[in-house]
Amino acid sequence: MNGLKPFIAKVASGQALTRDEAADAFNILMSGEATPAQIGGFLIALRMRGETVPEIVGAVTVMRQKMLPVIAPTDSIDIVGTGGDGTGTYNISTLAALIVAGAGVPVAKHGNKALSSKSGAADSLTALGVKLDIDPSVIGRCISEAGVGFMFAQLHHSAMRHVGPARVELGTRTIFNLLGPLANPAGVKKQLLGVYAPEWVIPLAETLRDLGSESIWVVHGNGLDEITTTGTTQVAALEQGKIRSFELTPGDFGVAQVELAALKGGDGEYNAKALRAVLEGEKNAYRDVALCNAAAALVIAGKANTLADGMALGAQSLDSGAALKRLETLITVSNGGHSA
Protein backbone atom coordinates (compact mmCIF):
# COMPACT_ATOMS: atom_id res chain seq x y z
CA MET A 1 0.00 0.00 0.00
CA ASN A 2 2.99 2.32 -0.53
CA GLY A 3 2.27 3.05 -4.18
CA LEU A 4 0.26 6.22 -3.62
CA LYS A 5 2.45 7.72 -0.89
CA PRO A 6 4.94 9.56 -3.14
CA PHE A 7 2.09 11.11 -5.09
CA ILE A 8 0.35 12.24 -1.88
CA ALA A 9 3.62 13.78 -0.68
CA LYS A 10 4.19 15.63 -3.95
CA VAL A 11 0.68 17.07 -4.11
CA ALA A 12 0.68 17.95 -0.39
CA SER A 13 3.90 19.93 -0.91
CA GLY A 14 2.10 22.08 -3.46
CA GLN A 15 3.61 20.56 -6.59
CA ALA A 16 1.63 19.52 -9.67
CA LEU A 17 1.75 15.99 -11.04
CA THR A 18 2.63 15.40 -14.66
CA ARG A 19 0.06 13.75 -16.90
CA ASP A 20 1.88 10.41 -16.58
CA GLU A 21 2.24 10.72 -12.80
CA ALA A 22 -1.46 11.49 -12.48
CA ALA A 23 -2.27 8.45 -14.62
CA ASP A 24 -0.10 6.26 -12.38
CA ALA A 25 -1.71 7.65 -9.23
CA PHE A 26 -5.26 7.19 -10.48
CA ASN A 27 -4.44 3.71 -11.71
CA ILE A 28 -3.51 2.87 -8.11
CA LEU A 29 -6.73 4.47 -6.83
CA MET A 30 -8.96 2.69 -9.32
CA SER A 31 -7.28 -0.68 -8.94
CA GLY A 32 -8.07 -0.94 -5.24
CA GLU A 33 -4.43 -0.61 -4.20
CA ALA A 34 -4.86 2.38 -1.87
CA THR A 35 -6.30 2.55 1.64
CA PRO A 36 -9.33 4.77 2.37
CA ALA A 37 -7.07 7.16 4.30
CA GLN A 38 -4.69 7.42 1.34
CA ILE A 39 -7.57 7.99 -1.08
CA GLY A 40 -9.05 10.72 1.10
CA GLY A 41 -5.70 12.36 1.73
CA PHE A 42 -4.79 12.39 -1.94
CA LEU A 43 -8.15 13.72 -3.14
CA ILE A 44 -8.28 16.50 -0.54
CA ALA A 45 -4.64 17.48 -1.18
CA LEU A 46 -5.50 17.81 -4.88
CA ARG A 47 -8.61 19.83 -4.11
CA MET A 48 -6.81 22.19 -1.72
CA ARG A 49 -3.95 22.82 -4.15
CA GLY A 50 -6.23 22.97 -7.20
CA GLU A 51 -6.42 20.29 -9.89
CA THR A 52 -4.44 21.03 -13.07
CA VAL A 53 -5.34 20.19 -16.67
CA PRO A 54 -2.54 17.56 -17.02
CA GLU A 55 -3.73 15.89 -13.79
CA ILE A 56 -7.32 15.75 -15.04
CA VAL A 57 -6.16 14.43 -18.43
CA GLY A 58 -4.12 11.69 -16.71
CA ALA A 59 -7.04 10.70 -14.49
CA VAL A 60 -9.54 10.63 -17.37
CA THR A 61 -7.16 8.53 -19.45
CA VAL A 62 -7.20 5.84 -16.75
CA MET A 63 -10.99 6.02 -16.35
CA ARG A 64 -11.42 5.55 -20.09
CA GLN A 65 -9.08 2.55 -20.10
CA LYS A 66 -11.05 0.86 -17.32
CA MET A 67 -14.61 1.67 -18.46
CA LEU A 68 -17.09 -0.69 -20.10
CA PRO A 69 -17.43 0.74 -23.64
CA VAL A 70 -20.50 1.23 -25.81
CA ILE A 71 -20.44 1.18 -29.61
CA ALA A 72 -22.21 4.24 -31.02
CA PRO A 73 -22.24 6.14 -34.34
CA THR A 74 -19.14 8.32 -34.76
CA ASP A 75 -21.29 11.46 -35.05
CA SER A 76 -22.97 10.90 -31.67
CA ILE A 77 -23.08 13.74 -29.17
CA ASP A 78 -23.32 13.79 -25.38
CA ILE A 79 -25.24 16.40 -23.40
CA VAL A 80 -24.11 16.12 -19.81
CA GLY A 81 -23.54 18.09 -16.65
CA THR A 82 -21.20 17.52 -13.75
CA GLY A 83 -24.15 17.84 -11.39
CA GLY A 84 -23.55 19.17 -7.93
CA ASP A 85 -24.55 22.74 -8.74
CA GLY A 86 -26.89 22.72 -5.75
CA THR A 87 -29.78 24.44 -7.53
CA GLY A 88 -32.30 21.59 -7.70
CA THR A 89 -33.37 22.24 -11.28
CA TYR A 90 -35.31 19.67 -13.29
CA ASN A 91 -33.44 17.41 -15.74
CA ILE A 92 -32.70 19.93 -18.45
CA SER A 93 -30.04 17.91 -20.28
CA THR A 94 -32.25 14.79 -20.39
CA LEU A 95 -35.04 16.67 -22.17
CA ALA A 96 -32.51 18.41 -24.42
CA ALA A 97 -31.09 15.00 -25.39
CA LEU A 98 -34.52 13.77 -26.52
CA ILE A 99 -35.08 16.97 -28.52
CA VAL A 100 -31.70 16.59 -30.24
CA ALA A 101 -32.41 12.93 -31.01
CA GLY A 102 -35.77 13.96 -32.48
CA ALA A 103 -33.90 16.40 -34.72
CA GLY A 104 -31.86 13.54 -36.18
CA VAL A 105 -28.59 13.64 -34.23
CA PRO A 106 -27.67 10.46 -32.29
CA VAL A 107 -27.16 11.05 -28.57
CA ALA A 108 -24.97 8.84 -26.38
CA LYS A 109 -25.93 10.28 -23.00
CA HIS A 110 -23.83 9.64 -19.94
CA GLY A 111 -25.50 10.25 -16.59
CA ASN A 112 -25.83 9.38 -12.97
CA LYS A 113 -28.10 9.45 -9.95
CA ALA A 114 -28.74 12.79 -8.29
CA LEU A 115 -25.80 14.59 -6.71
CA SER A 116 -27.37 17.73 -5.25
CA SER A 117 -30.83 17.86 -6.82
CA LYS A 118 -33.70 15.61 -5.75
CA SER A 119 -33.54 13.76 -9.03
CA GLY A 120 -30.71 13.02 -11.45
CA ALA A 121 -31.28 11.93 -15.04
CA ALA A 122 -31.29 8.27 -13.99
CA ASP A 123 -34.07 8.86 -11.46
CA SER A 124 -36.32 10.60 -14.00
CA LEU A 125 -35.68 8.12 -16.80
CA THR A 126 -36.49 5.22 -14.48
CA ALA A 127 -39.76 6.94 -13.56
CA LEU A 128 -40.54 7.28 -17.28
CA GLY A 129 -40.04 3.54 -17.77
CA VAL A 130 -36.57 3.52 -19.33
CA LYS A 131 -34.51 0.50 -18.19
CA LEU A 132 -30.97 1.53 -17.26
CA ASP A 133 -29.41 -1.70 -16.01
CA ILE A 134 -28.78 -3.04 -19.51
CA ASP A 135 -25.89 -4.48 -21.51
CA PRO A 136 -23.73 -2.20 -23.68
CA SER A 137 -25.09 -4.01 -26.76
CA VAL A 138 -28.65 -2.98 -25.82
CA ILE A 139 -27.53 0.61 -25.23
CA GLY A 140 -25.98 0.52 -28.71
CA ARG A 141 -29.36 -0.61 -30.06
CA CYS A 142 -31.07 2.23 -28.21
CA ILE A 143 -28.77 4.73 -29.91
CA SER A 144 -29.18 3.19 -33.36
CA GLU A 145 -32.96 2.59 -33.13
CA ALA A 146 -34.21 5.31 -30.77
CA GLY A 147 -31.53 7.85 -31.62
CA VAL A 148 -30.63 8.12 -27.95
CA GLY A 149 -29.07 5.80 -25.40
CA PHE A 150 -28.46 6.37 -21.72
CA MET A 151 -25.30 5.06 -20.07
CA PHE A 152 -25.58 4.76 -16.30
CA ALA A 153 -22.16 5.73 -14.92
CA GLN A 154 -22.04 3.11 -12.15
CA LEU A 155 -22.44 0.30 -14.68
CA HIS A 156 -19.70 1.54 -16.99
CA HIS A 157 -17.14 2.71 -14.45
CA SER A 158 -16.98 -0.20 -12.02
CA ALA A 159 -13.42 0.78 -11.04
CA MET A 160 -14.98 3.75 -9.26
CA ARG A 161 -16.21 1.35 -6.56
CA HIS A 162 -12.73 1.49 -5.06
CA VAL A 163 -13.02 5.22 -4.33
CA GLY A 164 -16.78 5.44 -3.72
CA PRO A 165 -16.80 4.87 0.07
CA ALA A 166 -14.01 7.41 0.64
CA ARG A 167 -15.82 9.99 -1.50
CA VAL A 168 -19.03 9.51 0.48
CA GLU A 169 -17.16 9.85 3.78
CA LEU A 170 -15.40 13.02 2.59
CA GLY A 171 -18.74 14.56 1.70
CA THR A 172 -17.19 17.29 -0.43
CA ARG A 173 -16.44 17.79 -4.10
CA THR A 174 -13.28 16.18 -5.43
CA ILE A 175 -11.71 15.73 -8.85
CA PHE A 176 -14.12 12.83 -9.42
CA ASN A 177 -17.03 15.27 -9.73
CA LEU A 178 -15.32 16.50 -12.90
CA LEU A 179 -14.12 13.17 -14.31
CA GLY A 180 -17.39 11.36 -15.03
CA PRO A 181 -18.60 13.64 -17.85
CA LEU A 182 -15.12 13.47 -19.43
CA ALA A 183 -15.19 9.66 -19.67
CA ASN A 184 -18.16 8.94 -21.94
CA PRO A 185 -18.32 5.16 -22.55
CA ALA A 186 -19.22 5.71 -26.21
CA GLY A 187 -16.08 7.78 -26.77
CA VAL A 188 -17.98 10.73 -28.21
CA LYS A 189 -15.94 13.51 -29.81
CA LYS A 190 -18.78 16.06 -29.63
CA GLN A 191 -20.21 17.25 -26.35
CA LEU A 192 -22.21 19.92 -24.56
CA LEU A 193 -20.75 19.79 -21.05
CA GLY A 194 -22.12 21.80 -18.14
CA VAL A 195 -19.94 22.46 -15.10
CA TYR A 196 -20.96 23.43 -11.56
CA ALA A 197 -18.52 26.35 -11.22
CA PRO A 198 -17.38 29.01 -13.72
CA GLU A 199 -13.68 28.53 -12.96
CA TRP A 200 -13.82 25.09 -14.62
CA VAL A 201 -15.20 26.24 -17.98
CA ILE A 202 -11.88 26.90 -19.72
CA PRO A 203 -9.80 24.16 -17.97
CA LEU A 204 -12.27 21.45 -18.98
CA ALA A 205 -12.32 22.71 -22.56
CA GLU A 206 -8.52 22.47 -22.53
CA THR A 207 -8.74 18.99 -21.02
CA LEU A 208 -11.10 17.73 -23.74
CA ARG A 209 -8.92 19.30 -26.42
CA ASP A 210 -5.90 17.44 -25.04
CA LEU A 211 -7.95 14.22 -24.96
CA GLY A 212 -8.83 14.50 -28.66
CA SER A 213 -12.37 15.93 -28.67
CA GLU A 214 -13.44 17.60 -31.91
CA SER A 215 -16.34 19.93 -31.18
CA ILE A 216 -17.39 20.78 -27.63
CA TRP A 217 -18.89 23.57 -25.58
CA VAL A 218 -18.20 23.72 -21.86
CA VAL A 219 -20.80 25.92 -20.17
CA HIS A 220 -21.76 27.40 -16.82
CA GLY A 221 -25.02 29.29 -16.60
CA ASN A 222 -25.46 31.66 -13.68
CA GLY A 223 -24.96 28.92 -11.07
CA LEU A 224 -26.26 26.05 -13.24
CA ASP A 225 -24.32 23.26 -14.94
CA GLU A 226 -26.37 24.02 -18.08
CA ILE A 227 -27.04 26.84 -20.50
CA THR A 228 -29.47 28.95 -18.50
CA THR A 229 -32.45 31.21 -19.11
CA THR A 230 -31.97 32.89 -15.70
CA GLY A 231 -29.08 35.13 -16.80
CA THR A 232 -25.72 34.90 -18.53
CA THR A 233 -24.05 31.64 -19.59
CA GLN A 234 -20.26 31.45 -19.88
CA VAL A 235 -19.02 29.28 -22.75
CA ALA A 236 -15.67 27.87 -23.85
CA ALA A 237 -16.08 26.39 -27.32
CA LEU A 238 -13.55 24.01 -28.86
CA GLU A 239 -13.69 24.20 -32.65
CA GLN A 240 -10.97 22.93 -35.00
CA GLY A 241 -8.43 22.69 -32.18
CA LYS A 242 -8.96 26.25 -30.95
CA ILE A 243 -10.84 27.40 -27.84
CA ARG A 244 -12.82 30.62 -27.83
CA SER A 245 -14.69 32.08 -24.88
CA PHE A 246 -17.94 34.03 -25.03
CA GLU A 247 -21.15 34.71 -23.14
CA LEU A 248 -24.76 33.99 -24.05
CA THR A 249 -27.99 35.50 -22.73
CA PRO A 250 -31.58 34.25 -23.09
CA GLY A 251 -32.04 36.93 -25.75
CA ASP A 252 -29.44 35.20 -27.94
CA PHE A 253 -31.88 32.29 -28.13
CA GLY A 254 -34.97 34.45 -28.49
CA VAL A 255 -36.47 33.42 -25.15
CA ALA A 256 -37.47 35.36 -22.04
CA GLN A 257 -35.31 35.55 -18.93
CA VAL A 258 -36.86 33.80 -15.93
CA GLU A 259 -36.26 33.42 -12.21
CA LEU A 260 -34.53 30.25 -11.00
CA ALA A 261 -37.77 29.13 -9.34
CA ALA A 262 -39.25 28.56 -12.82
CA LEU A 263 -36.64 25.85 -13.48
CA LYS A 264 -36.90 24.04 -10.15
CA GLY A 265 -37.61 20.34 -10.25
CA GLY A 266 -38.75 17.74 -7.76
CA ASP A 267 -38.29 14.01 -7.32
CA GLY A 268 -38.00 11.51 -10.16
CA GLU A 269 -41.77 11.18 -10.59
CA TYR A 270 -42.32 14.94 -10.67
CA ASN A 271 -39.52 15.55 -13.17
CA ALA A 272 -40.68 12.66 -15.36
CA LYS A 273 -44.19 14.16 -15.57
CA ALA A 274 -42.79 17.62 -16.31
CA LEU A 275 -40.55 16.21 -19.04
CA ARG A 276 -43.37 14.24 -20.65
CA ALA A 277 -45.66 17.30 -20.53
CA VAL A 278 -43.17 19.30 -22.62
CA LEU A 279 -42.77 16.39 -25.05
CA GLU A 280 -46.57 16.35 -25.40
CA GLY A 281 -46.72 20.03 -26.30
CA GLU A 282 -46.73 22.10 -23.12
CA LYS A 283 -45.00 25.46 -23.58
CA ASN A 284 -43.28 26.74 -20.45
CA ALA A 285 -39.93 27.69 -18.92
CA TYR A 286 -38.86 24.02 -18.90
CA ARG A 287 -39.35 23.86 -22.67
CA ASP A 288 -37.45 27.11 -23.28
CA VAL A 289 -34.34 26.16 -21.33
CA ALA A 290 -34.25 22.66 -22.84
CA LEU A 291 -34.55 24.17 -26.33
CA CYS A 292 -31.62 26.51 -25.60
CA ASN A 293 -29.43 23.56 -24.64
CA ALA A 294 -30.66 21.49 -27.59
CA ALA A 295 -29.96 24.39 -29.97
CA ALA A 296 -26.36 24.61 -28.75
CA ALA A 297 -25.96 20.83 -29.11
CA LEU A 298 -27.28 20.98 -32.67
CA VAL A 299 -24.71 23.67 -33.48
CA ILE A 300 -21.94 21.59 -31.88
CA ALA A 301 -23.07 18.55 -33.88
CA GLY A 302 -22.98 20.54 -37.12
CA LYS A 303 -26.73 20.05 -37.69
CA ALA A 304 -27.49 23.77 -37.24
CA ASN A 305 -25.38 26.72 -38.39
CA THR A 306 -26.72 29.20 -35.85
CA LEU A 307 -28.48 29.13 -32.51
CA ALA A 308 -31.62 30.45 -34.23
CA ASP A 309 -31.49 27.49 -36.64
CA GLY A 310 -30.98 25.18 -33.67
CA MET A 311 -33.97 26.64 -31.83
CA ALA A 312 -36.14 26.14 -34.92
CA LEU A 313 -34.98 22.54 -35.38
CA GLY A 314 -35.55 21.84 -31.69
CA ALA A 315 -39.04 23.33 -31.75
CA GLN A 316 -39.84 21.23 -34.81
CA SER A 317 -38.59 18.11 -32.99
CA LEU A 318 -41.01 18.83 -30.14
CA ASP A 319 -43.99 20.11 -32.10
CA SER A 320 -43.93 17.26 -34.64
CA GLY A 321 -43.87 14.64 -31.88
CA ALA A 322 -40.45 13.38 -33.01
CA ALA A 323 -38.84 13.89 -29.59
CA LEU A 324 -41.71 12.07 -27.86
CA LYS A 325 -41.38 9.20 -30.35
CA ARG A 326 -37.67 8.95 -29.44
CA LEU A 327 -38.62 8.54 -25.78
CA GLU A 328 -41.26 5.89 -26.53
CA THR A 329 -38.78 3.94 -28.67
CA LEU A 330 -36.10 4.27 -25.98
CA ILE A 331 -38.51 2.81 -23.40
CA THR A 332 -39.36 -0.10 -25.73
CA VAL A 333 -35.81 -0.97 -26.81
CA SER A 334 -34.26 -0.56 -23.34
CA ASN A 335 -36.81 -3.04 -22.00
CA GLY A 336 -35.82 -5.62 -24.61
CA GLY A 337 -38.43 -4.86 -27.24
CA HIS A 338 -38.07 -3.80 -30.85
CA SER A 339 -38.78 -0.40 -32.32
CA ALA A 340 -41.76 -0.12 -34.63
UniProtKB/Swiss-Prot annotation:
Mg(2+) 1 binds at residues 93, 226. It comes from Allorhizobium ampelinum (strain ATCC BAA-846 / DSM 112012 / S4) (Agrobacterium vitis (strain S4)). Belongs to the anthranilate phosphoribosyltransferase family. InterPro entries: Anthranilate_Pribosyl_Tfrase, Glycosyl_Trfase_fam3, Glycosyl_Trfase_fam3_N_dom, Glycosyl_Trfase_fam3_N_dom_sf, Nuc_phospho_transferase. The keyword Metal-binding applies. One of its GO terms (molecular function) is magnesium ion binding. Anthranilate 1 binds at residues 81, 112. One of its GO terms (biological process) is L-tryptophan biosynthetic process. 5-phospho-alpha-D-ribose 1-diphosphate binds at residues 81, 84-85, 89, 91-94, 109-117, 121. Catalyzes the transfer of the phosphoribosyl group of 5-phosphorylribose-1-pyrophosphate (PRPP) to anthranilate to yield N-(5'-phosphoribosyl)-anthranilate (PRA). Its cofactor is Mg(2+). This is Anthranilate phosphoribosyltransferase. Its EC number is 2.4.2.18. SUPFAM superfamilies: Nucleoside phosphorylase/phosphoribosyltransferase catalytic domain (SSF52418), Nucleoside phosphorylase/phosphoribosyltransferase N-terminal domain (SSF47648). It catalyses: N-(5-phospho-beta-D-ribosyl)anthranilate + diphosphate = 5-phospho-alpha-D-ribose 1-diphosphate + anthranilate. Homodimer. Transmembrane segments: none annotated. Pathway: Amino-acid biosynthesis; L-tryptophan biosynthesis; L-tryptophan from chorismate: step 2/5. One of its GO terms (cellular component) is cytosol. Binds 2 magnesium ions per monomer.
